[in-house]
């Protein structure tokens, strides 16, 4: 839906349901490295939704917004490996059941400002889904901001980007005992040469 040269709104939803044999999952060990484990049967299913909005704010000004939300259970349906095996019927370790993203890009001529927000639900660290102090990782949010400038020359197109990651210096873990970096900064320079384009334009 939308109005020409004013705004456009679109969206969708997808459902998936997969029964997977011989799923390989990598889990951390006490020695500090990851080791593969084979799961005979995994039931992965869920829904993913997305929405996109474009708004023309005025001459040379444009706002793009995208949002996604995912519900993705991944359940171990293998046979128990032993009488003490409590992993059957449980969510796979380190796989969030819920996740979401929202991005917004404000553009003016060759400048753009990008804001990205991410959410990940709690993740279990054990196949038994024990709700103990070290048995799960709490949910976390992540906020990133990027300023970008496009430059064009005869010989190449340049893209200059400066990013602030983890804008609010959140404490978060993606793997047990391995904290993710706090607020940090990145600079990108992209160069796209225009080989042969000037010669072709003269003909």
Placement of each model-derived feature along the sequence:
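Alpha-helix initiation/capping motif
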Residues: 2, 38-40, 93, 133-136, ...
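Gram-negative outer-membrane beta-barrel transporters
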Residues: 5-20, 37-124
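C-terminal beta-signal and adjacent terminal beta-strands/loops
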Residues: 118-128, 136-141, 147-203
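Short, solvent-exposed coil/turn segments
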Residues: 32, 44, 65, 97, ...
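Generic detector of contiguous secondary-structure segments
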Residues: 29-40, 99-102, 127-135
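Outer-membrane beta-barrel translocator domains and adjoining extracellular loop/strand segments
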Residues: 23-32, 76-85, 116-117, 124-132, ...
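Residues on the lipid-exposed face of transmembrane beta-strands in outer-membrane beta-barrel proteins
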Residues: 1-3, 47-53, 102-108, 115, ...
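Extended alpha-helical regions
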Residues: 16, 20-27, 42, 169-172, ...
């Amino acid at each position: 839906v939308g109005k020409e040269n004013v705004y456009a709104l679109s969206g969708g939803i997808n459902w998936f349901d997969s029964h997977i044999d011989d799923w390989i999952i990598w889990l951390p060990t006490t020695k500090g490295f990851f080791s593969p484990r084979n799961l005979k049967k995994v039931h992965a299913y869920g829904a993913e939704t997305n929405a996109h909005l474009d708004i023309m704010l005025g001459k040379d000004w444009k706002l793009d917004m995208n949002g996604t939300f995912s519900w993705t259970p991944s359940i171990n349906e293998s046979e128990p490996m032993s009488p003490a095996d409590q992993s059957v019927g449980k969510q796979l370790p380190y796989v969030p059941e819920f996740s979401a993203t929202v991005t917004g890009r404000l553009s003016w001529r060759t400048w753009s400002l990008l804001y990205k927000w991410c959410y990940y639900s709690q993740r279990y660290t054990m196949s038994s889904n024990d709700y103990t102090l070290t048995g799960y990782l709490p949910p976390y949010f992540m906020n990133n901001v990027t300023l970008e400038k496009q430059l064009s020359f005869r010989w190449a197109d340049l893209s200059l980007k400066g990013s602030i990651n983890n804008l609010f210096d959140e404490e978060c873990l993606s793997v047990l005992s391995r904290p993710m970096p706090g607020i940090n900064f990145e600079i990108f320079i992209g160069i796209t040469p225009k080989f042969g384009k000037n010669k072709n334009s003269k003909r």
